[in-house]
Amino acid sequence: MLYRAAENLPSGYKFVIWDAWRPFALQKELFISYSSKIIKEFHLENLTSEEQEHEIAKFIADPIPNEELPPAHTTGGAIDLTIMGPDGKYLDFGTDFDAFTEKTRAAYYETIDVEGDSKAKEIRNNRRFLYNLMMDAGFGNLPSEWWHYEYGDKNWADIQGKSALYK
């Protein structure tokens, strides 16, 4: 499916893949590492464990091996990517990959006033560009991460009203 999106990139533009399939062991390591960062970044220290887990799940999947609900990256159905322009530089998407802030939400720049702010408009347009390329190719987007797209996994299946292709 990614080749379909790549075919629609303008001449000289390329996808840069940061992450795709990952084993459960790596998913567990990332979950542990990122959980504490997310708690600090979003000031979740005073929430219950259950409330913290709910917020953390917006950014990284719990690595519990579950054949019915495996984390997207462990199925091979998820990809984290960006776009490189013909000048060899990444397009500006407003945050780094795997940043944990409100600005990482795919629609963040759709929800703020960007009039008169050329940088914010550029970021919004770059996110729209990536989003439309991937959605037109059949992917789904994880709303909390502008760089994360899925095809064939449980989240994609829920959105598409289909059965998951990858488990």
Model-based region annotation:
Residues M1-K167:
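Cell-envelope/glycan interface and biosynthesis
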